[in-house]
Amino acid sequence: TGVQTCALPIYGYQIAGFADRTTLVDNNTWNNTHIATVGKAMASSEERAYPILRKHDVDYVLIIFGGLLGYSGDDLNKFLWMIRISQGLWPDEIQEHKFFSNGEYRVDDQASATMRNCLMYKMSYHRYNDLFGGRAGMDRARNAMGPSTSPTLDTLDEVFTSENWLVRIYQVKKEDTLGRPLPLAHAFEQGKRLHQAPFPLNADAIVH
């Protein structure tokens, strides 16, 4: 109890019912600003999304990713309506056309910089290449290759990924105790890990 999760509104009831946790929005949310806020966080870069999540006391972020399983009803395929709702309130900050590449909604290396840098994209493909020996992996939901390099996250920690990678949960980091910007603190920790045993590059590395 006391833990708040950020997810698409359609998952709010399930999270509340099965996990006894509150969500920022759910199916019954009538306040369009709340829904747009979730969309804004997902559509923003980590740098811009982190203050939004912290302001609303979000502890965890849950997404549904169908790339490995081939589930086309995942959050990346629902992402555009989140972008549109957010653009309605913040047209100067969230602009749908910036998520397209030459008019196409792409997820491979030809995806737009805005798409590749947004929180939704990073959470979806974080460590995905680990399953394919470090190479780009096939996204079966979109019938396209994913990015050649898996995105890294500075402000979130992966705490759960289901065996088929459908459910992914990330914990929002607290501010660094030494006052460092989180990207700098993360880079320092990554440097320390280079001297430790490597994280296994296969599906067994999933956090259960």
Regions found by a protein language model. Name each.
Residues 1-208:
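Extracytoplasmic
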